[in-house]
Amino acid sequence: MSNFAVSLPEVIAVLPAAGIGSRMLADCPKQYLTVGGKTIIEHAIFSLLHHPRIQRVIVVIHPQDTQFSRLSVAQDPRISTVYGGDQRANSVMAGLQLAGQAEWVLVHDAARPCLHLDDLSRLLSITECSQVGGILAAPVRDTMKRAEPGIQAIAHTVDRQDLWHALTPQLFPLELLKLCLSRALREGVAVTDEASALEHCGYHPILVTGRSDNIKVTRPEDLALAEFYLTQRQSLNNDSL
């Protein structure tokens, strides 16, 4: 057993993968598209399982999903599956029900195949100093424009000084995330990521600076970019051997 597992709190990961990814214009959900020799979801799962502090990964799938069980990673004893709901928050809640007595839970997008181990380690380190949790995020570098309501015309430029792109994984105490998600769902709040549920309840999660190449594959052009990042990483790994 690793020193991480002995000295630091147990962390369970939840991977919501019940969406259909209609913006990809593909014949299958985006998480099952192949990039860098593996499906996107396999890359996402392996990036978590390679860290010694991640004890289990709970994959939340669509009730009609027949593809995940065919993947070799589905046979890993550290993998559990559960059916999700029609919204991300419902799917995450379904995953949390299988988390048992874990102290901390980490939620990662199934469509983010390029997570770096050092980013994950930095995020996990906040369990030693925070009771609220935090997220990987990247400072906004582009000039941001707000549009006029209902039309594609610029209303004004948004000050990017304190703007961040929210990424995943996002890490929170299990019971706190359950409480905040339940309240947000009950009150009809739009939960676009787990941090927004905590924000709704008055909490302020930590922003942990992450790499901007931790992209979410959402549109067809993202596949080529993910392929480039993964190929580049593999090349660097081979050069270091």
Curated annotation (Swiss-Prot):
GO terms for molecular function: 2-C-methyl-D-erythritol 4-phosphate cytidylyltransferase activity. Pathway: Isoprenoid biosynthesis; isopentenyl diphosphate biosynthesis via DXP pathway; isopentenyl diphosphate from 1-deoxy-D-xylulose 5-phosphate: step 2/6. Belongs to the IspD/TarI cytidylyltransferase family. IspD subfamily. The record marks R160, K216 as: Positions MEP for the nucleophilic attack. GO terms for biological process: isopentenyl diphosphate biosynthetic process, methylerythritol 4-phosphate pathway. Its EC number is 2.7.7.60. The keyword Transferase applies. Homodimer. The keyword ATP-binding does not apply. Keywords: Isoprene biosynthesis, Nucleotidyltransferase, Transferase. Catalyzes the formation of 4-diphosphocytidyl-2-C-methyl-D-erythritol from CTP and 2-C-methyl-D-erythritol 4-phosphate (MEP). The record marks R23, K30 as: Transition state stabilizer. CDD domains: CDP-ME_synthetase. It comes from Yersinia pseudotuberculosis serotype O:1b (strain IP 31758). This is 2-C-methyl-D-erythritol 4-phosphate cytidylyltransferase.
